Structure formats: structure tokens, C-alpha cells
């Protein structure tokens, strides 16, 4: 029915009339009479059937409902005895669906659930009254919908006079939301059933998460940015919040336009109106016509051609609706600049060629989801003290909805005022079946699909998260061709019933549950509809046996998906059970609890002479298939995917069979498989997985016909000795890992990109290896017979990863230039000279007993980021490392004595994370340890400067760590103590904005020298306290060691762990809130040693230390005057700066020590650095006078500092370091 603004009814009743739907025998002389009186006293026009002449037909009452603005539906005990009441309710439901009516349900001494679910005597009376009536289904829908609207309940304890006042208040509130009739700015379609009886203030829940959505949409409509007329599409899945967003947009933007209109519920209205009424409705609103029966569409054009208009069209569902409005939309585009049109739809294809831009409404985030759910779950009880007790359960419901606003509203509403037991029960029910109110939303979109699209949607649900190509292949081999399958996937994507992400077809969890509900309902009906059997209880417990034995039901089964992990009891199949399943397309017996599918106890017993005449089957997955071959009557003519892992098969089938559609075959760990002759005609095969087929000795020569084969996995085929000569032009990945008897590798494809030959018996690579110009990864790990790498490898210009680990006889690596080689693993080889490849980023030389030193030129490998030297037991020294090195692991280099000075070059703009590990380097000399600590100090200084300069130190993260044998905290740490806990009193303003991070140190000792660990991690819990606050402890990493590749090791010596972390968030909060205040503050630190996730009691922190690291302001004298905080105990004494570089007090001012390589300075009143005429100390001895060249450098640095040339100073400083 149309809205009242364009009604043709003459002598309309008074404006905003209220219609009361009730059972007269129950309420007319009592409650309703009082209610009518109260409404009239509040100047509200009210209509009840007493006003109609006796004998008037029911159609007159239904017309009055159409003409009304608000309906009060009063449900009482005998309501369902009256067919008139129920037919009125049906009309009320239709009008609310159209958006022309506000319904307020009143439950008179009845529970809303009794009405909604037609329970008890109320339901019995309905069933008796409606028996045999064809309208029964529509009536039930009305009972299901109307009680879900927020209404008013009157129980035995209620004071009826108070409830009457409450109803009057609700009516008055609802009336304020309905625009005056004839208003040219009216919304076409009133409040509908969305928020009847709520005040505008209560609608704030509609905006949870909507602020950002509205902002993003407004950016696309921006009138300043886009001067011309602009049409925007708002798209998203059903129930995602498009209508809410558009109403909010319309409310915000309507005042910016001289003419504006919103037409909502176009999908519903189009079912009840002729399509040519849509443009009439729109023109009527824009033309300020009270009764817009516009026959000549050109008339309004001349009136409005020079006006800017805003048009919002909500819930457009079909192309015909767009076409009906096309002329007006074209006119708007050609009219005055600045007009805006917004079209909301759940079908993106409808916006193609029409809109200038599209805004896709996304799911709500977790915070907004929780707020929206809580609002509806506690709508009348937001301050409920028990609300927190429901938080954990709330998380479960929010997770279930996955950010879907309508689902959150529905679930919250269904749980409102319910007990915790009810909440728990509801969650269990949702695991089995979704809420009917959520299903109904998706059902509308599903019903509009074609039959082919419905089948595709339900099929895709069976294979969600699979590759798009795989899904399309399954669909294409069904009733659809290849083009039709791709079209079906695109159409469902456009309608937001599925989506593609990273090449996979995905489906929202709610839609997935909806699809299963559809199949479940089909299974519970007479079996005439095709269906897919999902749940094991429906398949096993009276399901599959019953279905297989019933010819009609069996013939309509489209798919069986049985999770063997859910099967508890032994089940036996008869040899003839599959005979009647002529339409079966998908048969899948799998195990969800074991991804490898290797530990399943198969409880499905199969007879030896099983009949399997499944001509239509597309996908056959059968874990641990027990027969030696597939039955003779099995016809793979339509088979696309065959997966029989851990089977007892010796061959696929006897003889040759046509397999024109077969693209994927997986027979992994079928240990008895000895022949692949059945695949001779699989010319479209793309992937073949034969991993663990230990009996397979050879490949048939017919495999050369597989020109589309791209992936071949033969890992662990220990009996395989060779491959036939062939050219598989599409082959990209070949895996022969663990084929221990495979001796000679023939080049079977020039297009291989990934080649795994690890664990084979090959002794050399093929002579024509250079043909593999697309080869990216070559893995030859554990090829013990391999003695050399041919120089021809240097011609593989695409090679990026070369793995030669544990090639025990490999002694020489050729001098080659592989320009793109990034990863080179030579661990466990006998190579004596480290190769130098300019592009290498990851170099592993661990477990090499031959290398005694590294080439000096390693410092020039600017791309090297990871150098692994573990257990290089002959290595005695290391040279200077390149500046970009992020990880050096020298664990267990027991002969290592010296390191270069400097250890590594440091760039002035250094921001890289880096870790240098020297654990169990038991012979490391003291000078080497001092260089490591000195490097750590310089690294902290430069990181503090760089991080502050380039990102403001906004990110809290671990930037540097090192560990080495030792028993002392380095002297440059200003706070230290014995033990694992450190209490520090900090000076006022310690948290100023120059604070860049914290340096931490721990000396760790092993209490049990025989203890072996695979991981050791040192962390510090940092907590700041002052007079007003106590922050939550912040955990900072100090350092760690991990034994990669498995195994354990001893950490016998005491070790020093040093770590630098950018300013923790808790300190930054302190800094931001109190940087101008002078609050004495103390910090508490506790250092802990863990073995991964839990504390390791066999390791003890002997000593620990802390320094706060500050970055110098750019307008100060020295870019590198990185200062460290000081010990309070020494800061008030007259001290001179010794070897520890600690604080000196001069004329009452604190002096911050700078890097010792600078001249000693004092700090003036203005905080700037002044040169002090005093002999500089070095290790307690007077420093010899420097040559004039160094003095000249320092003079030049001072001049450059005055001129602000910071970078130049940094470069000089790094050179001096």
C-alpha cells in the first residue's frame, strides 16, 4: 500500500489517527475504554471499530488501518479466537513492512514469547481457529514479527492506570517522529517496525560504529571537493546497516538542499506497487505535491531544473527499479550542479554504469559490536549491577555475529531480561540452528536468486575458504558451464552472499549457518528437494542408512559431508547403499580434528564388493579408503577432485577410464600404491600429490600427456628411482624430498620455479641446468652424495634461495654472481671459504668446523641482514660487520676470541632492530666484551636520536639486544644493583619529551650447569610510581637466545644480557600528562628469566641495571649529546667524572655525561654544552694529546654544530667511533 501522502482515499480521517486492534469481548468495556479516554484527553485522535456502522464489512476496518499512522495491537488471552483480530494483524504487518505504519504491541497479561511462538492456550486457540485456512502461514508470520517490536507488557501485578499513561506517552513519542502529512521534505514511509515506542534519544544505539561510516560516506559526497552532480552507491550484505546509515545521512544533509526526498523499503514497495508509481512518489516529494498523480513527467522538470536536490533511495533490489527511476536520475545529473543521489543496495551489479563512486559498508569492529549488543541485551536495564556477570557470555554472542549489526540487535533483543541460564541455553541452540529472525533477513535475498544461483550458493557453502579456481571448477562440472560458473560466483559476490579474499571464496559465518539451515530444512521435509547432508547425527543416527535405503530421498541427495571425528559408534554400509544416489555430486569423509588426516580410527565399515555407480560425482574425498581399488562401476567421467589419503589402494581402478574433468588428485600416504596407470587419460590434471607413497617405483610414460600439470609432490616416495623423459611444460613445483633412492634428476620442465631435491641420492645436477631460467628456490639439503655445485648455477638469474645444508661432502662454493640470490644456507657443509655474494640477505654458515675466520670484505655486503655462525667451533675472530646487519648469531663459537673494533658500522639514521648473540663463546677476550658493550652503548645513543627524529618515538618496541659471557653490568649503566629487583629514585622532569627509551641489563647465572634448554629469555617488568598514580606494569624484553632447528643446549657460564627498548607506553602516558610538573618519582624493576612462556627456576639474575636514554633537541649544541640519567646518591656530591662516566655536580647544576669519546663537558645554566679545560681521562689514565688533525676535526664539528649541520656532525662522530 502507498503512503498516506499519495493516497487516493477521499474524506481522510484526522491526521495521525491511532487505530486500536483488540479482542472486544476481553477488553472493550474495561481497559480499552480507559485507554481511549486517556488518548482523547491528550488530543490524540483514536479509532476503534465502535465507530463503524454495524454490518460494515471487514474491508472497511482494513482501510482504516491503511489510513492510520499508529496501531496499538493489544494481545489478550482470547485474541486468537477472533479471525477479525488476526486478519487485522495481518494487515498491520503488511503496512509496517511497507513503512507506512508504526505498530506498538501491548501484551495484556501475556508474555511476548507466548504471542510470538503461539504457545499454550493462546496458540491452541489459534490453531483451532486457523485450521484448514490457507492464510495460516501469513498469520503466523504476523505473530512472529509484531511481538518482536519493542512494546509494553501488562501483567497481573501492573497498575493499569499507570500502564495507560505509559501507552499514551509512547504514542506521543512515536507521533513526534512522523512528519506532517503533505510535507515536501517527508520521508516516504514512516518509522515502520524499527523503533516504535522509543524516543529520539533512545535511537543513539543506531549510531554505534556509525560515526566513522558516516564520515567516510560524506567524503565521497563532499560538495566542496566534487562540484558537479554526484551519484553514490552504498552497498553491503543484508542487515549490515545500510538503512541506518542512509537515515543518518539524510537527517544530517537534508538542510543543505532546497529539495530532498528519501524513499525507503523500495524492495517491499515494488512488490505491492506498479513500478511506474516509484517515479511519481519521488517527483511528488521533490515537487511539494500533496497528491502527486503526475502523468506528464516533464512538468516538474521545468519547476526544479535550477534547484539542487538530495535524493536517497534505500533497499533497491532489482534493475527494473533503477530503470523506472532512470529518467529522473538522468535529469538530476543534467540539472544544477551540486545535487546528490545516494542509492543503497545489496547487489553491487545494480550500480554498474550508474554511480560515480561506491561506499561499501563493512562489519562493525569488536568494540562497537559489544556496545550495540549490550544496548539491546540490557535495553531497559543499562545500569544492571549484574551486567558484568554476563560479559563473558556477551563475548560469545558478539563473536557469533561477527560484526553484523542486525544480528547483534536481534540476539540482544532476544536475550533482554533473560536469566544467565537462558543465555547459556541460547548459545547452545545457536550452535545447532541460527535465530529465525536472522534467517528471515537472508531469506529475502536468497529467495530472489535463480535456481542455478541457489544451488551455487549452497554448493559454495560446502567449500568455503577454498581457492576460487577450485570452486569454479566444481560448479562448472555440475549443471553450469565454465562461463556460467564464473558468472554465478560473480553474481553471488555482487549480492554479498559470498566474497573473494586472496584468491579464496569466503562466506560470512551467519550466511554459512543460514545455508546449512536451508539444507537442514530440506532434509526434514519429504525429500523432494535436493539437499546436502552435513551433521553427523543426521547422517549416521538414522540418517544415511535411512536415506540410502529410501530411493526417493537417496536420489535427491546432492552432497554428503561426514566428519569422522564425530562418529562414536561403528557403522557398516551395505554394498548396495550408493546405488540409488544418481545425483550425488559431493562425497566427503574427513577428519576435522587431524589436519594431516593420519590418526583417524575409521569407524565406517565398507564391504569388499561395494557398488559405487556415482556418475555425477565431482568431488570424492574418502579418508582411509579401505579397498584396493575403486569399484569397477565407479565412473569418473565428471570427477574433478579425487582425494584418498592414507588409503589401502594399490591402483585407482582397473584399466583406463575417461577422466576429462579431473584436475586434482591427492593419494598421499597410500603406502601400497604401486601403479598410476589409471591416470593416463587425465590430460587436464593440475595437481598430483603422492607424498608418502613408499611402494611407488616408477611413473608411466603416459604422464607426458599431462601438459597442464603444475604441481607434483613425490616427497617420501622412498622406492622411486627415476622419472621418465618428458616435458611437462606447465610444471612449476616439483618435490622429491626424501626420495632416498632417487639418484639422477632429469630436466622434465624448463618452467620449474620451485625444486626440492633435499634428501635424495643425487651426486650432481643436470648438465643443462641453465635452462631453468624461472627457478626461484633450489633446495638440496642433506644431499650427502653431492660434492660440488657447478658454475652453471650462476646462470640462473631468477634464483633467490639456495639451500645446501648438511651436504657433508660439499667443500667448495663456486665464485659466481647470482644477482638476485637472497638466501644461502651452507650450514653443516665442509666449505672453508665464505662466498661473497653482494645481494645475499640471509647467510647461514653454522656447524662448520673448517672456517677459522671471515673475509674482511664482509663489511661491504650492504644487503646482509642475517648472519648465522652457530657452532663454528674453529672460528677465532670476526671482522667488522656491515651496517644493515640485523641478526648475528655466534652461539657456541667456542674458539672465538676477538671481534673487530668497531664491531659493526653504525649509520647516523640507524633505525633497524638488531640482535647480536655471543652465548657460550667461552674464550671471548675481555677486550672483545668491552667492544660489544661499547657498541651497545653507541647503538642506544644513535637509536635514541634516530627514533626521536624520524618517528617521534611513538612506537614502543625492542630495538637492540645482545648477550655474551660475563659477570658485570657495564659501567655506563647509571643504576645497578645485586639481585633481580631494582628500586630507583628518579629526578624531577625525568620524563621530559627528550626521553627516547630505556637500556636494561641483567647478569644471568645457571644454577644447574647440566641443564639443557631450547630457549632462554630475559624480561623486565617496569613499573613507575609517584604520589598520585601507580601504572600497570609494563614488560620490556631484555634479550633472548633460541636453539633453532630443535634440540637443546647447555648455558654453563654467567652471561650478560643488554637490551634497548623505545620508551614504553606507560612512561609516555606519564610524560604526556606530567611533563611540566615537578614530581619526584620512583621506578621499580624486576628481571625474570623464562624458558619460553614460564619462569625457569634453574636460572638466576645475579645483577641488573638501568639507564634512561635521552635524545638531544635538534636546536641544542650537539646532535649526539645523548645523555643518561644519574644515581641520586652521587648527584649531590662534588665528584669528578671517572671511568664510569657518571654525574658530576658543578655549581649546583647537574651534568649529564656524554659519550666518552667526546671531550669532558660541563652543563651551563641554559643547558648547553660548554668545553671544560680539564685533562680527559681514559681508563683512569691521562689521555695523550691528540694530533692537530683530530683537533681540527673537533673544531670543524663545533662550527658545524653552531651552523645547525647535524648530519655532518654525526658522520664525523661515527668515523671517530
Curated annotation (Swiss-Prot):
Q: Where is this region: Disordered?
A: 1162-1195
Q: According to the record, what induces this protein's expression?
A: Up-regulated by AvrRps4 in an EDS1-dependent manner.
Q: Which residues form the NB-ARC domain?
A: 211-472
Q: Which reaction does it catalyse?
A: NAD(+) + H2O = ADP-D-ribose + nicotinamide + H(+)
Repeat as a keyword of this entry, yes or no, is: yes
List residues of the TIR domain: 14-175
MF terms per GO, please? ADP binding; NAD+ nucleosidase activity, cyclic ADP-ribose generating
Annotated function? Disease resistance (R) protein that specifically recognizes the AvrRps4 type III effector avirulence protein from Pseudomonas syringae. Resistance proteins guard the plant against pathogens that contain an appropriate avirulence protein via an indirect interaction with this avirulence protein. That triggers a defense system including the hypersensitive response, which restricts the pathogen growth. The combined presence of both regular and alternative RPS4 transcripts with truncated open reading frames (ORFs) is necessary for function.
Q: What is this protein called?
A: Disease resistance protein RPS4
**Whose protein is this, by species?**
Arabidopsis thaliana (Mouse-ear cress)
- Record gene name: RPS4
